[in-house]
Amino acid sequence: MSDIFPESHPEHPLNLIPELCRKFYDLGWATGTGGGISIKMGENYYIAPSGVQKERIMPNEIFVLNASQDVVEEPRTEKQLKISECTPLFFNAYRLRGAGACLHTHSANCVLISLLCDREFRISHIEMIKGIINNETKKALGFRDTLVVPIIENTDFEKDLTASMAECMVRYPESCAVLVRRHGMYVWSDTWQKAKGAVECIDYLMGLAIRMRTLGLEWEPKGAK
């Protein structure tokens, strides 16, 4: 069960989502109004608005939803904000994985990897793999384990990814992430801390894999110890 914080607490989703959006923007993961973040606390689901400058989101601009995906609290602002286009995809993670947070990035590394791979991104024998949790066993992957991130095809509208993402999550029960070709990536976990750690590790591994490819190095080295 997630901790319940007062609105004044820095880890309350109303404060945490804007902070994480700024960090994602600085990393190039949420530029041009792209990307999104959702965090669950108690019975409520907090979601950043759509089509706004992610580095400038304020606590009073967050939507609050219930488990039925109904908005129970509108942003406390006069701005005419629209709920994130990612909302039904975030709820895939909540409903199918019991996640506590789901993060969506438009990282260039994710897009490039989706172009280099067919149906999956696979990599092993890299230390940062240890920072990713097997979604089924809830245990961290080991150095010799293979990280597998499945890839789905992009659509014209974000909401139209909902069904294919859900089907992919069923086919890959161990994965905590789904790549969307030519688009970005969704990552989830039990807590926002674990989801943040996972997306950082996966993006690092993807960036490394791109460089390895230019050097002729294998992502899954045969006979490696």
Swiss-Prot record:
GO terms for molecular function: methylthioribulose 1-phosphate dehydratase activity; zinc ion binding. Pfam families: Aldolase_II (PF00596). Binds 1 zinc ion per subunit. Its main location: cytoplasm. NCBIfam families: salvage_mtnB (TIGR03328). Catalyzes the dehydration of methylthioribulose-1-phosphate (MTRu-1-P) into 2,3-diketo-5-methylthiopentyl-1-phosphate (DK-MTP-1-P). PANTHER family: METHYLTHIORIBULOSE-1-PHOSPHATE DEHYDRATASE (PTHR10640:SF7). This is Probable methylthioribulose-1-phosphate dehydratase. The lineage of its organism: Eukaryota, Discoba, Euglenozoa, Kinetoplastea, Metakinetoplastina.
